[in-house]
């Protein structure tokens, strides 16, 4: 289960299973002229959307987490996320490996043995980033997730609206979109 938290709270992120929606027809683009060096540093997971039933079942218990993005030796990214789980701070690191164009990465889940694509869809580097992840846990078990990252724990209302519109364009419904509440736990520098 810790792996689930790693994935959800990291790109906040990947590898959770559950009830599935039909995937939308549109392809997700990547941030034009993505500048990886500007993307580094501290981010907060402010919003999530997923076709997984796990999110709908657990969203009331989720809270914002802190993630730190650092360069990896292979040109990819190390995403280290710290989150509250069972009243304790847990830290997990994911290696996002380069996958084609700048801003496109892949992540291999050690728990499921599946590979997920992770795309930086849009970012201004200073305030927000929209990420989209997709993959398959097995035949017929497609996984999709969108994540809103913010440089602060209080993203502007316009960013939440932008995230909601992006999620709906990807086929996510209101009940699959959640904005994570702020917490003072596990947010300090370590």
UniProtKB/Swiss-Prot annotation:
GO molecular function: prostaglandin-D synthase activity; retinoid binding; small molecule binding
Superkingdom field: Eukaryota
Name of the protein this chain belongs to: Prostaglandin-H2 D-isomerase
Localization (cell): Rough endoplasmic reticulum; Nucleus membrane; Golgi apparatus; Cytoplasm, Perinuclear region
Catalytic activity: prostaglandin H2 = prostaglandin D2
Species assigned in the record: Pongo pygmaeus
SUPFAM superfamilies, per database record: Lipocalins
PANTHER family from the UniProt entry: LIPOCALIN, PROSTAGLANDIN-H2 D-ISOMERASE
E.C. code: 5.3.99.2
GO BP terms in the entry: mast cell degranulation; prostaglandin biosynthetic process
């Amino acid at each position: 289960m810790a792996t689930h938290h790693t994935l959800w709270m990291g790109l906040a992120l990947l590898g959770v299973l559950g009830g599935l929606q039909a995937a939308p027809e549109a392809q997700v683009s990547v941030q034009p002229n993505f500048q990886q060096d500007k993307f580094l540093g501290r981010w907060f997971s402010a919003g999530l959307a997923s076709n997984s039933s796990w999110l709908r079942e657990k969203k009331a218990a989720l809270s914002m987490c802190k993630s730190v993005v650092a360069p990896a030796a292979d040109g990819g990214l190390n995403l280290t996320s710290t989150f509250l789980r069972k009243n304790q701070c847990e830290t997990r690191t994911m290696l996002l490996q380069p996958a084609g164009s700048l801003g496109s990465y892949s992540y291999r889940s050690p728990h499921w043995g599946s590979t997920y694509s992770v795309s930086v869809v849009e970012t201004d580097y200073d305030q927000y980033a929209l990420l989209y992840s997709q993959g398959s846990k097995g035949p017929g078990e497609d996984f999709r997730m969108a994540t809103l990252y913010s440089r602060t724990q209080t993203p502007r209302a316009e960013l939440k609206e932008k995230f909601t519109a992006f999620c709906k364009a990807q086929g996510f419904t209101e009940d699959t979109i959640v904005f994570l509440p702020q917490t003072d736990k596990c947010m300090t520098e370590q």
